[in-house]
């Protein structure tokens, strides 16, 4: 007879301020699914709030081993680590995100990464990917800038430069 592991998941929680911010960011984005990236961890509350209020696959990046270990442990206890969330120990400034990956990019520690937003913004997906950097000087070219609840927000609007409007098979079946 096979024995089954009786594992009870712990309940994940986030502070009210992070829950409110996550809800606002999700509303401002193109939808509650896709990839969200959190660059720089404080207590991990914003990462947890994004997981609780959306269907995002969340990638959290921080260079502090203790913060990474703590958040991984909480997410593993909740049954979310590896299925909906990854926590990477790496510098959030030098993480080299792939282009067009994220629906949403944000941070729990805006002062630690304020100089890198021009490069980080390249990881936003076309047609509405947003970044909430917390603080930002200037505006990366090709992005729309706005304010969300007092925080600067940048959005990649429309198609990528040089891309074509697809008019393939059955696009014009008059």
Which sequence ranges carry the predicted segments?
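Conserved SAM/SAH-binding beta-strand->alpha-helix loop
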Residues: 64
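Glycine-rich SAM-binding Motif I of class I
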Residues: 40-48
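Noncatalytic, solvent-exposed loop/strand surfaces
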Residues: 1-33, 38-39, 51, 57-60, ...
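S-adenosyl-L-methionine
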Residues: 69-97
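ADP-ribose/adenylate-binding Rossmann-like module
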Residues: 129-137
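A short, aliphatic-rich alpha-helical micro-motif
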Residues: 30, 98-99
């Amino acid at each position: 007879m096979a024995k089954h592991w009786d594992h009870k998941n712990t309940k994940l929680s986030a502070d009210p301020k992070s829950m409110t911010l996550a809800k606002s960011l999700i509303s401002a984005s193109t939808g509650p699914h896709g990839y969200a990236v959190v660059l720089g961890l404080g207590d991990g509350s914003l990462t947890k709030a994004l997981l609780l209020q959306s269907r995002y696959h969340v990638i959290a990046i921080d260079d502090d081993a203790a913060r990474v270990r703590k958040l991984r442990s909480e997410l593993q206890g909740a049954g979310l680590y590896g299925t909906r969330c990854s926590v990477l120990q790496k510098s959030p400034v030098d993480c080299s995100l792939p282009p067009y990956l994220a629906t949403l990019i944000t941070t729990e520690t805006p002062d630690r990464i304020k100089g890198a937003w021009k490069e980080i913004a390249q990881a936003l997906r076309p047609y509405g990917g947003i970044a909430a950097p917390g603080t930002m000087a200037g505006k990366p070219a090709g992005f729309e800038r706005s304010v969300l609840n007092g925080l600067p927000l940048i959005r990649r609007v429309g198609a990528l430069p040089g891309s074509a409007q697809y008019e393939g098979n059955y696009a014009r079946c008059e």
